[in-house]
Amino acid sequence: MKFKKNDEVIVIAGKDKGTVGRIEKILVKENKVIIKDVNMVTKHNKPSQQNQEGNLTSVEAPIHVSNVAYLVKKASKSSAAVYSKLGRVTNKDGKKVRLVKKTKKEIQ
């Protein structure tokens, strides 16, 4: 998985296209990420003995990593947001580092 927790990303496909957020959780086996306040779905909770009335809660649903890109620069009044896919490369020290493909810069 090329993304890490707390990376700032932009959604590039789906109903929340163009939305910017931070990664809260990574689901490695499913190849999905959960982004704060993005892809909200309504969950119906059944009534139980502790909770006599059922209720509706909003929860973030996972998004596939192919629909998310790393945010390089936020949008401003004069320019659009710059985003790119991530890659991995081995640097001179022999360590694997994450690389922004568009700008060819390493990130931590």
UniProtKB/Swiss-Prot annotation:
One of its GO terms (biological process) is translation. It holds the Pfam family KOW. GO terms for molecular function: rRNA binding; structural constituent of ribosome. GO terms for cellular component: ribonucleoprotein complex; ribosome. NCBIfam families: rplX_bact. One of two assembly initiator proteins, it binds directly to the 5'-end of the 23S rRNA, where it nucleates assembly of the 50S subunit. Part of the 50S ribosomal subunit. This is Large ribosomal subunit protein uL24. It comes from Mycoplasmopsis synoviae (strain 53). The lineage of its organism: Bacteria, Bacillati, Mycoplasmatota, Mycoplasmoidales, Metamycoplasmataceae.
